[in-house]
Amino acid sequence: MPIAATFEIEYLQYLDADGKLVRDDLPAFARDVKQLVELYKLMLFVRVFDGKAIALQRTGKLGTYASCLGHEAAHVAIGSAMQEDDVFAPMYREYGAQFYRGVKPREVLLYWGGDERGNDFSGPAHDFAWCVPIATQCMHAAGAALAFKVRKEPRVAVTVVGDGGSSKGDFNGAINVAGAM
């Protein structure tokens, strides 16, 4: 059979499948073992919290609950990369980022238990509340970023969207707003 194409994809790898270093030029954050351990502890906490919340939901003790299973590392990384005065416009399952930024587990449970006071969380007051409708948080982040640009503030607005959100009008509108800035 004839070959239509061959190609190689370059990638950057620091650990092999056994967790052993394959490079010596680690980024600065990865050389801080204490910080890495703290981030890992938070990832583990998020995994355990998520499991407990799912159990509460499955037994009728908690309302709708959006699991974050498998997203722990990505969400903790988002929280750890942000500065305190940056703005986070979460979707509805970025607990790792929110815990890193000061939101309390009790507040998450309050919200998903039907008590809107859970949205009055302990994290930065300028972070947005959870958005359950798909992709609506994208416009919030784009608007905050535009305000930072107009005011010449060295801040960022961060949001997260899933695969389904990229087909929504709010996602596309936010991309247009961001591109026009």
Positions of the model-derived regions?
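Charged, compositionally biased N-terminal leader segments and the immediate start
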Residues: 1-28
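Cofactor-binding active-site loop characterized by glycine-rich and histidine/acidic residues
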Residues: 48-51, 55-181
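N-terminal cap/recognition module
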Residues: 23-41
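Residue-level detector of secondary-structure boundary/capping sites
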Residues: 31-34, 44, 69, 100
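N-terminal glycine-rich anion-binding loops that anchor highly charged ligand groups
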Residues: 13-20, 41-54
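Short acidic-aromatic active-site loops that bind/stabilize oxyanions
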Residues: 33, 42, 130-134
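A generic structural signal for short, non-catalytic loop/turn and secondary-structure boundary residues
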Residues: 5-8, 36-38, 81-83
